[in-house]
Every structure is written in structure tokens, then in C-alpha cells.
Amino acid sequence: MTSPVPSEPVSEDTHDSSSGSEVEPSKTSTRAPKRRRLSESSDDSDDSYVAPAPLPTLSRIKKKGAPDAKPAAPAGQDNPVLIRDALEIGLREEASSFAALNVAPWLVGSLTTMAVRKPTAIQKACIPEILKGRDCIGGSRTGSGKTIAFSVPMLQKWAEDPFGIFGVVLTPTRELALQIFEQIKAISAPQSMKPVLITGGTDMRPQAIALAGRPHVVIATPGRLADHIKSSGEDTVCGLKRVRMVVLDEADRLLASGPGSMLPDVETCLSALPPSSERQTLLFTATVTPEVRALKNMPRSANKPPVFVTEISTENQGTIPPTLKQTYLKVPLTHREAFLHVLLSTEGNASKPAIVFCNHTKTADLLERMLRRLSHRVTSLHSLLPQSERNANLARFRASAARILVATDVASRGLDIPTVSLVINYDVPRNPDDYVHRVGRTARAGRRGEAVTLVGQRDVQLVLAIEERVGRQMEEWSEEGVSIEGRLVRTGALKEVGEAKREAMVEIDEGRDVLGRKRNKLKKVR
């Protein structure tokens, strides 16, 4: 049986005069066609070709490029803002009122490129007053935008009269200093601003050269800047005598007295700067202490305006975001590590970026090694690590290469890592204010977060003091279908965690790093 010949496509240019059902092939052309072309007329012998109708996709593209096409929708959250459009968008958008705060147009545009278009309460309150030249005490909970509240007016006043070292920012930790340094660099990108970072853990010589080069803004930890003032020579630090603006970020920690106080170093730094009557002083903190308030009562020159004080108060005394869920988990003293392992492994927490806070560096070191052996993606941040390793570990956590950061209170202040959705207090902090700063690493800028505190029999009074400080009681931790005690028994986690802990302790005793490599005890002589 002969199979039927498949039908060939027929040109759309059809004439009624053509013969009924029979179609003849066209006469041979000088250019041999790759495929047999059919024609409806026997006398159609030329090589003319009728193009097929455009494909729908092509026609849609054509319509987009047509002159009468509608203009593209303005860039939203899903569309990146181009630098050339940022200024126009920032000044035009009603939702953004930075322009209404008398912020310079170039700064409005720079903030818009960073997706910062609407000022927060602390920014609305402080920016206009700082631009007027007033000293300022700004109190607002963590994650409320205090860095922008002092950076924007500082950069605007510097741009009006750029010279030498215009501003100094003091902050208690190296990681927070690095974060402020990077944020100021980003905001000042349209201008030729020269910030410099002065922190411990790195060589002093390049820092001394940078200070002698008269940078525009110095971001420093008090201890290292005090070392330069004492030992680097007059030529290095003489530029500090013309500073116009000084910022104490996390001022409660900088001005606190007692063991480990930074106050002597802060006083050394301030002694190298102009007197308070000749400079502008800004204090920002999440917890306004009596030492911070004391700035308001300092003697002032007659021509200087009074200190501006603002405490942005919301519910829960303005310390804990309403989007933060606070819980506690009762744990026996001998099985705290096993409870932590199971808590991090539940269905609800297994994928959450988390920070685990400890009271001691040795505890943080041990937990990192133990959790690594239990197949958690973990890194650490504490003072036993060299500065280069601290920076690298923090970068890994920011980039989600590690899901868990085990840290001491060195990471509790100021660090802004928006992805963090879980904070675990492995050790209950002794000071309720430290608890406020720890849990402030999550639920930032309106996002949701959870804080879980592991509570033993000896920690009850500490928890009660924390609840009184924040004005809210903790709830007992629970997850649907999950029993921590049941999983410990059923899965054999107690034995697994015990073995991992013993291996970690042996590794520490042998002087190995977290990857099991033998540490080189020879130190470089500087």
C-alpha cells in the first residue's frame, strides 16, 4: 500500500483563478531551491519569494519599540535603580522625604541607589537638627538606621567645606567600625571622599601613613586611635586638631566604666581633638544611659545651640522590635550542647541563618569545632581569632557560605546582616542591655525574627531581669510536631554530640585550628 505524500506548505498569496485541487510545481529556476517550492500558477517562473507572516514573538518585540508604545513602568523593588536615574527618582518620589529634611540632592540620589528612599524615625528627628549645627544624643532601638542618621549630615557638611580630617567616628568593635567605613564609602561614592579605617589587629604603619595623609573621615576603635595619638608622632595626628564633627556610636559602651572600660582610651582620643565648644558632638546608642545623658549638662559656650536629645520610643520601651518573637527553652546543664544541636536541626530552623551567642571565647571556639563535626555549616567570631580571620569569617557568613555564626558579644553591637532570622543565646547574658543588643541582630528594619534563650536552673533570675528590662515576657519555645527531649533519645543525638565534643576538645589541646591543621606558633616580628 502506497503511503500518502505529506502535504507541503502553500503560499498564503492565493488566487481564486488557480485550478481547483491540483497544484503544479514551478518551473526550474537558475538558483536551485533547497526545498521544492509550490506555486499556484504554472506560468510563475520567477524567483520571487513571499515572506511568511511575522511570528507572534517578533510582532510583540516590534510593538515594544514602536513610537506609540507606552512608556516603561517606573523602577520598583524588582527593578534596579540606575545611577543616572537615582537623583530624579529620589527627588520626585513622594514616599521619599529625605529632600524634605534638607538633605543635599547628591546625597538623596546616592541613598536612592542604595534603595534607601524613606527615612526612619531617628533619621527624621536627627538629620535636620545636626544640619543646624546642634550637638545630638540619639537613642533608638537596633536596626533603626542610626548610621545613616549621622553619616548623611556629616557628609553634607563636609561637602560644603571639604578639608583635612573633618570627622571622627569612634565605635567599640572592629567589625562595627568596618561596617560603618563601608557604608560611608558607599554613601559618599559620588564625591571624592577619603575615609580611613583605624582598628586593632593590623599593622600600625600603614594606618599612620593614612592618618598623615589627612583623610576626610576617620572611623576608628578608641584603643587603636589612642595608640596612634601616644606613639605615632605629632606629624601623624596633628590633623585631628581641626576636626569639626565627632561621633560616638554605641555610646553607652564607649562611656561605660568598670572592668574592661574603654573610657580612658576615649578620653585620650578626645584630648587630641578641638574642645567641645569648637566641634559638633553626636552620641548614638540603643540604650541611653546616665553617662550618655551627661553630655546634655556639659558646660557650653554662649554662641552654641543647646543639645538636641531624642529617644524614639515605641512599644516595649523602644528596645525590642514588635516583629521579634522571644522564646526560652529549658535545658539541663549537662546536655546544653545536645539541645543546641537538635534545636538547630529542626524542620523550622534547619535552613535559617542563625547567630549563636556565648559569654566566653573558649565556649565559642569549642562550639564551632563541635558543630562543624555535626555537619553544620558554621563559622565563628570572637577575640581569640586574628583580625584577618575575623574579617574572613564574617564575610563567609554574610555571603551565606556559613549558615551559623558562633560569636561572643563582639558581634552583638551594630552588625547589620539582614538575612539573620534566628538568634540563640547559648549562655544567658549577665547584663540585660547585652540581651537587647544580641537579639537586635535579627528582626531588623521591620523584618521578622526569633530569639531563643537556653535557660538552666541557675539562669532564672537573669531571665526575670531581662523580661523586666524589655517589658515583655518570653514564651516557651515550641514547634509543631517537635519534642527536643524525644529527638535526643530517639535519634541518639546525645552520643553523637558527646563524641563530637570530645574530638573538639582534643583538637584544642593539640593546638590545631578548626580545620585540624597544626598552628604555627612562630609569630611574625614587626
Swiss-Prot record:
PROSITE patterns given in the database record: DEAD_ATP_HELICASE (PS00039), HELICASE_ATP_BIND_1 (PS51192), HELICASE_CTER (PS51194), Q_MOTIF (PS51195)
Domain named Helicase ATP-binding: residues: 127-306
Gene3D superfamilies per record: P-loop containing nucleotide triphosphate hydrolases (3.40.50.300)
Residue span, Helicase C-terminal domain: 338-485
Keyword Acyltransferase: no
Keyword flag Chaperone: no
Positions occupied by motif Q motif: 96-124
EC number(s) from the headed UniProt entry: 3.6.4.13
Protein location: Nucleus, Nucleolus
Gene Ontology molecular function, alphabetical: ATP binding; ATP hydrolysis activity; RNA binding; RNA helicase activity
Catalytic activity line of the entry: ATP + H2O = ADP + phosphate + H(+)
Protein purpose: ATP-binding RNA helicase involved in 40S ribosomal subunit biogenesis and is required for the normal formation of 18S rRNAs through pre-rRNA processing at A0, A1 and A2 sites. Required for vegetative growth.
Domain notes: The Q motif is unique to and characteristic of the DEAD box family of RNA helicases and controls ATP binding and hydrolysis.
Name of the protein this chain belongs to: ATP-dependent RNA helicase dbp8
Species: Aspergillus fumigatus (strain ATCC MYA-4609 / CBS 101355 / FGSC A1100 / Af293) (Neosartorya fumigata)
